[in-house]
């Protein structure tokens, strides 16, 4: 990796955040697979550190949260003791928060879809906010105690609970059952009913699946190591927050949120390595 100049590194990183697999990047750039992977992991650590230090004291008003599924090494049904001994494998969930106004992603967390990860995620989110916010999640029960632990009573929280129809008997589906309706449920505080929504975070989930090859469903593209999975998300969200101009806002989410006063380039992200 030390032999790559900034332009070549930028080419590799651009491909990573625009939905290319590691092997396709090798074919396009001529950079070796090991070098691409090493750059990803090292840059991911630098991006994670930068966002952890700078995405604080945020003046968000409305925040939406959700979880997105992926797997590492193999799907959960194929996990064996031998595979577990070699490292993390099976289903993994990425918990994501988004500011509904600025589209900034203040934090994300990789773990299981369980109460422990939910609590850690909510405590991380609460620690980044400068004021009381309206929070909306789906109907996952893990959020109830997690939000209570992280925010106490200093939150306007509601759930948007989707109602699904039944699948025709004997029919298999790759997507969830058809959503036939939604129920808004106030949990704590005084959330504005007009803003009880998960539309932005669900659109963010699609952005992740389109932008990171390892999240693309029904393919053989998946993370082989948890370290690479975390690194790819860190690089992507650094790019999403600071480099990628949001079409509606016409600025980056970081600029809209007042975190940055300028438009970053991918070369600026690479500069974090130094």
Segments predicted by a language model, with ranges:
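Residue-level recognition of single "structural anchor" positions
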Residues: 1-274
């Amino acid at each position: 990796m030390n032999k790559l100049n900034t332009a070549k590194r930028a080419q590799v990183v651009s491909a990573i955040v625009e939905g290319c697999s590691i092997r396709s990047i090798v074919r396009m750039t001529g950079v070796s697979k090991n070098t691409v992977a090493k750059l990803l992991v090292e840059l991911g650590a630098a991006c994670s550190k930068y966002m952890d230090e700078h995405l604080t004291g945020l003046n968000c008003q409305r925040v939406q949260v959700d979880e997105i599924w992926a797997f590492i090494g193999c799907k959960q049904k194929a996990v064996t003791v031998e595979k577990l001994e070699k490292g993390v494998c099976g289903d993994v969930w990425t918990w994501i928060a988004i500011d509904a106004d600025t589209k900034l992603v203040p934090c994300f967390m990789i773990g299981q879809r369980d109460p422990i990860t939910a609590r850690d995620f909510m405590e991380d989110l609460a620690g980044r906010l400068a004021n009381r916010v309206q929070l909306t999640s789906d109907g996952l029960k893990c959020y109830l105690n997690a939000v209570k632990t992280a925010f106490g009573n200093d939150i306007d929280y509601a759930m948007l609970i989707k109602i699904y129809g039944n699948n025709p008997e004997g029919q298999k589906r790759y997507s969830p059952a058809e959503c036939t309706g939604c129920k808004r449920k106030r949990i704590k505080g005084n959330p504005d009913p007009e803003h009880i929504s998960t539309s932005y975070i669900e659109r963010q989930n699609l952005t992740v699946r389109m932008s990171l090859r390892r999240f693309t469903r029904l393919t053989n593209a998946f993370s082989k190591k948890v370290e690479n999975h975390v690194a790819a998300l860190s690089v992507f969200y650094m790019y999403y927050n600071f480099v990628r101009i949001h079409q509606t806002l016409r600025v980056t989410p970081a600029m809209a949120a007042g975190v940055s006063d300028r438009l970053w380039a991918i070369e600026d992200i690479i500069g974090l390595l130094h």
